[in-house]
């Protein structure tokens, strides 16, 4: 599903290659935090507490608020895409 999302933002939304790469990196980091391979991503197993825990972990790891915001934006965009697919 994540690959499909990245293809969508690259082709349909015409995001820059750099943005697509960064979103891919952000979503891989999200999956790693969850302990999943990127291919194992299952949005139905997640909730807001998972996102909040990831955000707090990133801040504790010393990431800037700007970086955290961008990573959360990638996750939010992915979920918006999945909702549009009816998932």
Where are these regions (language model features)?
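N-terminal core-binding DNA-recognition domain of tyrosine recombinases/integrases
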Residues: 3-18, 24-87
């Amino acid at each position: 599903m994540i690959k499909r999302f990245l293809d969508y933002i690259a082709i349909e939304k015409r995001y820059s290659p750099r943005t697509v790469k960064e979103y891919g990196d952000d979503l891989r980091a999200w999956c790693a935090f969850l302990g999943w391979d990127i291919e194992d991503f299952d949005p139905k197993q997640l909730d807001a507490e998972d996102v909040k825990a990831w955000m707090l972990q990133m801040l504790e790891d010393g990431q800037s608020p700007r970086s955290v915001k961008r990573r959360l934006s990638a996750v939010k965009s992915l979920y918006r895409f999945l909702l549009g697919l009816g998932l």
